[in-house]
């Protein structure tokens, strides 16, 4: 399940008079990391460009996301060297990073670099591990560098009573049968969180989403998944129908020629 964005409004205001944004670390922790009905919950920032370099050595620009240890439980990666940063690393804000194979090779010429040090925008980070490259089509997991968000000041980049920030939440259920319970608990946590706010309240516009709905969600627009599926079915039907019509026409044309030959 996914919560890619949220809305915030003045307490008691209408949903139409609201702003849409990513959630803050505080909102993510209190409203989603606290879920007990889910197997795991991770907070993930959007990819940002970062300068990855060696002191007086090679450098490369890469896409970096900030996340936590639960990310490595929810998404499966193939480690070529080392391992993911741990819960202890994440809780303590240890400056450690996981690199993609492409970035490791550009910098070191090899992927066997766990334990070595790189600079991310001139800040030193220890390399925990190296993973096989991730396709940009894997939008929820893609990056070239992953670091704990506790190792930066991203938690302080929050506004509107610290509800809005730069994070999104990904929730792993034990099974699809748990989706209703997870959504119900998320709503309970949302109401509890709003009670703690003085002037604001947050809401999710139908989220958490399943994967298909998440792909088509655009900020405040709740995707009409039934209409999207019908549209795809129509396109597929047309793609299948056109060759069938062409084949029928060819068969009919040949039959007419044969009939003419027979007399």
Please give the residue ranges for each predicted region.
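Structured, solvent-exposed hinge/loop segments at the ends of secondary-structure elements
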Residues: 1-107, 111, 119-125
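Intracellular coupling helices
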Residues: 245-263
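Mid-to-C-terminal secondary-structure elements
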Residues: 65, 69-84, 95-223
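Faces of alpha-helical transmembrane segments in polytopic inner-membrane proteins
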Residues: 238-245
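Membrane-helix interface segments
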Residues: 58, 178, 226-230, 258-259
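Residue-level recognition of transmembrane alpha-helices
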Residues: 122, 185, 235-236, 254
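N-terminal membrane-entry
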Residues: 220-237
């Amino acid at each position: 399940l996914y919560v890619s964005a949220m809305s915030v409004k003045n307490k008691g205001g209408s949903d139409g008079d609201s702003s849409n944004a990513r959630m803050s670390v505080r909102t993510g922790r209190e409203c989603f990391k606290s879920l007990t009905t889910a197997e795991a919950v991770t907070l993930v920032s959007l990819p940002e460009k970062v300068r990855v370099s060696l002191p007086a050595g090679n450098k490369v620009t890469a896409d970096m996301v900030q996340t936590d240890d639960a990310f490595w439980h929810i998404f499966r990666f193939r480690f070529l060297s080392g391992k993911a940063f741990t819960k202890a690393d994440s809780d303590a804000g240890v400056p450690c990073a996981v690199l993609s194979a492409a970035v490791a090779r550009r910098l070191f010429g090899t992927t066997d670099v766990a334990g070595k040090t790189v600079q991310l925008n001139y800040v030193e980070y220890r390399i925990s591990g190296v993973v096989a490259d991730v396709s940009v089509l894997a939008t929820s997991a893609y990056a070239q560098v992953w670091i704990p968000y506790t190792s930066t000041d991203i938690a302080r980049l929050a506004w509107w009573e610290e509800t809005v920030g730069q994070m999104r939440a990904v929730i792993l259920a034990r099974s699809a049968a748990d989706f209703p319970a997870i959504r119900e608990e998320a709503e309970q946590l949302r109401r509890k969180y709003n009670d703690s706010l003085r002037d604001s309240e947050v809401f999710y516009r139908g989220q958490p989403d399943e994967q298909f709905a998440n792909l088509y969600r655009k900020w405040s627009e709740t995707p009409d998944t039934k209409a999207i599926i019908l549209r795809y079915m129509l396109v597929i039907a047309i793609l299948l129908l056109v060759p069938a019509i062409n084949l029928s026409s060819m068969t009919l044309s040949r039959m007419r020629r044969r009939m003419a030959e027979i007399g």
